[in-house]
Amino acid sequence: MNTKEINRVLQDTFNKELTEGKKRHIVFWYDEAGEFIEDIDELNLEGVRIWKLTPHNMFATKLEVEKNDVNSNFLIYANMAKPSAREDWLLDVYKYSQEFATDKMTVMMRELGITNDAALRDVFKKYTKFFKSKEREALFKSFSVPEYTEEQIDLVVLASLCKCNIVNLDEVIKALFREQLKETNKYWENIRKFGNEETFWNLVEKTYGYNLQDKSINSLLIFFLLTNVSETLSGDIPKTWQPYISAIPMNAIVFMNQFMNHSADEVIYNELANTVEKQVKVTEHLQSKEIKDYITSDTFCCFDTNIITYITKQLMNAIHDYTSYIEIIAARRKLHWFSVFRNEYEALYQAIQLFQQIYEMGNAITESQPFDLFKAYESKYHNIDTAYRKFYVAFDQIEDKDGFRALRDKVENIYTNVYINDLAIKWSDALEGEQEEYWPIAGLESQHTFYRSFVQPFVNKEERVFVIISDALRYEVAKELSNMLNVERKASTDIVAMQGVLPSYTDLGMATLLPYKSITFNENAEVYVNDYKASSTENRATILSKHYKDSTAIQYKDLAAMNRQQFRDVFSGKKVSYIYHNVIDARGDHAATEHEVFHAVEQTLKDIRSLVDQLINTVSASNIVITADHGFIYNRDTLQASDKVKKDFLNTDIEKRRFIISSESNSIEGTMNFSMDYVLGEGSGKYVKVPRGANRFAVQGTGANYVHGGAMLQEIVVPVIKFKNDRSKSSKNDVRKVEVKLTSLTRKITNSITYLEFFQTEKIEGKKTPLRLKVYFTDEEGNRISNENIIIADSQSSKPEDRTFKEKFVLKSMTYDKTKKYYLVLEDEEEAVENIYEKVAFPIDIAITNDFGF
């Protein structure tokens, strides 16, 4: 009964017919507890005077009612006990009036529909202080409760005091933990002042098994964390931890799983866990454990730091158990702290990839002919460059690099002095032995025939084609880009390698991508195509349109600034469109920013993927070709003087770190000499001299760590991605996630701990992409009743055993109704709307136990 309801009842009382010769209604209301003292002024009774009686105005009240106003109806409200007859100055008035009686608990119970349960009256009385506040009362009433029991009332009070959205002890505990890092835990203060501490601790003990004598929110936090640790930590549990481990751990384990893995609580949980980790000296206790003892433990971050340190030391000590390390990292991917240490794990993974590939090829490049070495780089060696690049992308983002500096040095040493050095020797020897000043290599697709090979076929068929040229997009980067594009939309994507021009620098590389009859140098060594200077976008557009009138050229940065209509207008009526993108070379070609080149690669991958989407969605592009003018070499460490080649003559047209163009045909020690007739025409009289391997010429100017222009495979293996959007009804190019099936035969749960097996039905390849699932149990209403497991189905293995997942489910300790439905839910983590991948009915028949159910 709220104020409105009290007003109605009193109004009905005053509206009743007068009997026994009475001329008016006088109603006394004694509210000794003051439960309605805030409500009395809000009453609006028609034709009734409300008079407040106090111990000090009894005579004045008697005078007012019997002398001054003998006609009005009176509600006489008294915030005091009803006086005895001897002390009651208004006894004569009381005898011909009537009394209105109610109390807060009666009103509350009546409003909540509790009319015949006297036992619950004492429960409500326990919270008299709580219900004195209108705000708290309103919060209590705001919760929808199907049936009130003593425990339910306790929980609603706790939920109200902790500002929870639902009535659930788990939510109350979470709210208390969220406040624990603050100077004062306001929710715990609320419980102490307006709730009942003893009731709270009794509920916690009953639900989670917490029974420490020294009860506090901090010790409760330790209890939850250590109980959770005990579920995954192998071997003996430290004696000092044992009092904090629940005898009925299921509910605590499920609580912890939901608390630590909820995105809204992740930061709070991490701070709490780090505080407790120090309090209970987890790191010290782990010294007596092996890595295998806590490979799936994720309560504290020291599990991850120990594992990261372990793998790092193993790699530093050249322990070649690479498969084991990758399995450990794969296991950690599903666990809580992985996101915090993502960069550390990624750096380890890429270091493993680099070391493993070099180790498996016997720490040496196989001697081969130029053609075979080119093809070997295209098929496998480029992966080492990718691992090196990705190692640094991750390493640069690690906040505390101290633990990784030695590994970084080893990565640098192995990459530079084993891989690059050996590749440089074998490749240079092969070129000198077979090519004898002749470029290009026979049998390979050549960059200087790019237009004829990859653009002219579309012109011949009068099909529209877009050519994206990204400066310094080397082959290994394009390979990653091709893989990304392949699984991002319905399309066919293929990548091939061209042999780039020599020298592999921008002016010449860009020129050979155009349709040309002649390429020449002027007296300033500037490149001309068909008598047009080829360095400007405007001139390139002219060269293109002279060959085929419906052609254009534009810079990516100009496109990026356009609105949708402007974007359409640029390509309106055009059949051949060249789009120039420059991020990698722009960053790498300057000493101040060359160390950022790998991060420029990341930006390039984003830019081109976005551009492809825009071309398809805005101008309905179908045919897109992506290529580059050249690749690049990059080493993080400063070059030694021995890596630089001195020039012995001055008669040069162009001098750069990786090449010299000259009219001199003689060779310089430490270099290779090639005629440029292949691109400039017979009798050009121009020669390019490049240092053997990855060495640089000693010249003044830009940075020396990022270079291009030479003949190393990283520079001259130029990618061509052939992308064709597919709008057909055929499913040939459909992108789809692999399937995961529940393979366990059982469809009934009889134990609080249950293991279920799942199977990735096919390996990742082609258009089949990974599937990431959250898997858990719920009741009919969708409330979670178990921990949550993560399944990452991304195996590329052909072996079924490598695509099998065995997951452990811990169910809450509660009463399960055999007649009700419970479900195993498989939720696609990456889907925002239709995220339920599968829902499997599971009857649950578990006897309530006080242990793990064994």
UniProtKB/Swiss-Prot annotation:
Query: What is expression of this protein induced or repressed by?
Result: Part of the pglZ-brxL operon.
UniProt record, GO biological process: defense response to virus
Which Pfam families does this one have?
PglZ
Name the domain of life: Bacteria
Q: What is this protein called?
A: Alkaline phosphatase-like protein PglZ
Q: Which UniProt keywords apply?
A: Antiviral defense
Q: Does the keyword Transit peptide apply?
A: no
Q: Which InterPro entries match?
A: Alkaline_phosphatase_core_sf, PglZ, PglZ_dom
Q: Which organism is it from?
A: Bacillus cereus (strain H3081.97)
